[in-house]
Amino acid sequence: MTELVHTRADLAAARDGLTGTVGVVMTMGALHSGHETLLRAAREQADNVVVTIFVNPLQFGPDEDFDRYPRPLDEDLEICRRAGAAVVFAPAVPELYPQGQPRVWVNPGQLGEELEGQSRPGFFHGVLTVVLKLLQLTRPDRAFFGEKDYQQLTLVRRMVRDLEVPVEIVGVPTVREPDGLALSSRNRYLSPDGRTAALSLSGALQAGVAAAAGGADAGAVLAAAHAALDAGPPGVQLDYLVLTDPELEPGPVTGPARLLAAAWVGTTRLIDNVSVQLAPRY
């Protein structure tokens, strides 16, 4: 039986009633198969699963889609029930931010100003602030985050480590459609032509992976990804395409790396990333 709570007090009471380990999955709702994968991972690795559903206004810029962001709570609850979640915490904005905005924010550091942070100023301040708040409220043993939002995952791990938050952060691989498109709640905004164009993003990343598997160096991997993107259908406005190390530091010459991309397809912003293994240089 899944318990739905809307207030911090009711969440505290529900959390106190859980015995054994607790895993939390933080979402903004509009759940899809990618979220279901997170829920399954949490269910496998914890005795109890707490899901948070909260469209966080702090991580939306003035020209972004906060008001139109989908909020199908009944559908989300059914997914949580099927997944065996013990508690769903779905607060209203004033419940988490009674004064409208917090007076103390989490500063993500330099990495929070790069990539997504450069295109969306203040975004990761809002993300880390709400994540820390929800970690304090849910008191989990483990928290599960998708690798699709790889920069977010990396920053959450840094925050937990630097601030000594007693929780294990578990990254869960990206879930994709059969044609390779990374699952995202924002995919529902895409027109049929836009969805076809969006495949260029995952196609470019896979071209980079293939180039690396063939022995290409970092520059050639990026060139292969750019070439695949340029050869794709029109309608994709690239924001960034970068190759870094797994901690999002400047790209390595050899070994494990991360290839990340972001683009606009019409009015919809999409992000994606893949792991890349660069061949040793002799």
Curated annotation (Swiss-Prot):
Name of the top EC class for this enzyme: ligase
Name of the protein in question: Pantothenate synthetase
Protein task: Catalyzes the condensation of pantoate with beta-alanine in an ATP-dependent reaction via a pantoyl-adenylate intermediate.
Keyword annotations of the record: ATP-binding, Cytoplasm, Ligase, Nucleotide-binding, Pantothenate biosynthesis
Residues reported in the UniProt entry to bind beta-alanine: Q59
GO cellular component: cytosol
Binding site for ATP: 28-35, 146-149, 175, 183-186
Reaction(s) catalysed (UniProt annotation): (R)-pantoate + beta-alanine + ATP = (R)-pantothenate + AMP + diphosphate + H(+)
Note: The reaction proceeds by a bi uni uni bi ping pong mechanism.
Subcellular location: Cytoplasm
Lineage start: Bacteria, Bacillati, Actinomycetota, Actinomycetes, Micromonosporales
Residues holding (R)-pantoate: Q59, Q152
Chief location bin: cytoplasm
Protein family membership: Belongs to the pantothenate synthetase family.
